[in-house]
Amino acid sequence: MNVLSCSINTLKGLYDISGVEVGQHFYWQIGDFQVHGQVLITSWVVIAILLGSATLAVRNPQTIPTGGQNFFEYVLEFIRDMSKTQIGEEYGPWVPFIGTMFLFIFVSNWSGALLPWKIIQLPHGELAAPTNDINTTVALALLTSVAYFYAGLTKRGLSYFGKYIQPTPILLPINILEDFTKPLSLSFRLFGNILADELVVVVLVSLVPSVVPIPVMFLGLFTSGIQALIFATLAAAYIGESMEGHH
C-alpha cells in the first residue's frame, strides 16, 4: 500500500510539473489585447545575447581575424554555404534572413538548457526557451512562408502561381494544401522537439537530480542545434524552390 501511495504521489508530482511547463502562461494586458509576456521576455533576452555577442566580436575588426571575430566569420561562411547550396547562385540577398533564422533558433534552443530561467518567478507560468512555445515557432514558420512567396513573386511575377496547376490542373487543391502544410510542419517539428526535450530533463531532474540528467542535457543541446539547422535548411530550400519553379 505504501508503494502504491508513493507511486501515486510521484505521478502527481510529474503531472504538476507538466502542467506548469505546458498549461500556464503569463500575459500582459495592453488595451483589449493579451500579449504573451513569457515569449517576449525570453525572445528579448535571446536577441540581446545575439546583438551583444556580435558587437563584442566586431568592435575592433582585424585583417587577420582572431577569437570572437574568427568564430563569427566561420559562422557566416557556414550560413553562406548552406544558403548557396539550397537557393543557388542568387543566394546573396537571402543570407541575412537565413542567418537570422538559424542564429535565433539556435540560441533560443540552447537557452532552454543553459540559462537559469526557473530562478525568475512569474505570477503565472515559467520562463523557458522561446521555441518552447508554439506562438514563436508558428511566427517563424509564417515568416518563412512570406519569404518564399515573396521570392517566387519577385523572381517570376504572376507566372509563379502557374505552379499550382502543374503538372495537371487536377492537382490544384493538393498544391495549395502543400503551401499550407510547409509552415505547419516547420513549426510543429521545432516546437515538439524543444518542448519534449525540456520536459524530459525536468522529469529526470525530479527523479534523479544528480547524474542521469547530465547526458540527457548534452543530447538535448545536440538535437537543439540540429533542429535549428533543419529549420534554416528547409527555409532556404523552400525559397530556392519558389525561385526555380519546380518541386
Curated annotation (Swiss-Prot):
InterPro entries: ATP_syn_F0_a_bact/chloroplast, ATP_synth_F0_asu, ATP_synth_F0_asu_AS, F0_ATP_A_sf
PROSITE patterns the record matches: ATPASE_A
Bilayer topology term: Multi-pass membrane protein
Keyword Repeat: no
Transmembrane segments: 38-58, 95-115, 134-154, 199-219, 220-240
Subcellular location: Plastid, Chloroplast thylakoid membrane
Signal peptide start-end: none
Pfam families, per the entry: ATP-synt_A
Single GO molecular function: proton-transporting ATP synthase activity, rotational mechanism
GO cellular component, one term: chloroplast thylakoid membrane
Keywords noted in UniProt: ATP synthesis, CF(0), Chloroplast, Hydrogen ion transport, Ion transport, Membrane, Plastid, Thylakoid, Transmembrane, Transmembrane helix, Transport
Function: Key component of the proton channel; it plays a direct role in the translocation of protons across the membrane.
Family, similarity comment: Belongs to the ATPase A chain family.
Quaternary structure, from the entry: F-type ATPases have 2 components, CF(1) - the catalytic core - and CF(0) - the membrane proton channel. CF(1) has five subunits: alpha(3), beta(3), gamma(1), delta(1), epsilon(1). CF(0) has four main subunits: a, b, b' and c.
Protein name: ATP synthase subunit a, chloroplastic
Lineage per the UniProt record: Eukaryota, Viridiplantae, Streptophyta, Embryophyta, Tracheophyta
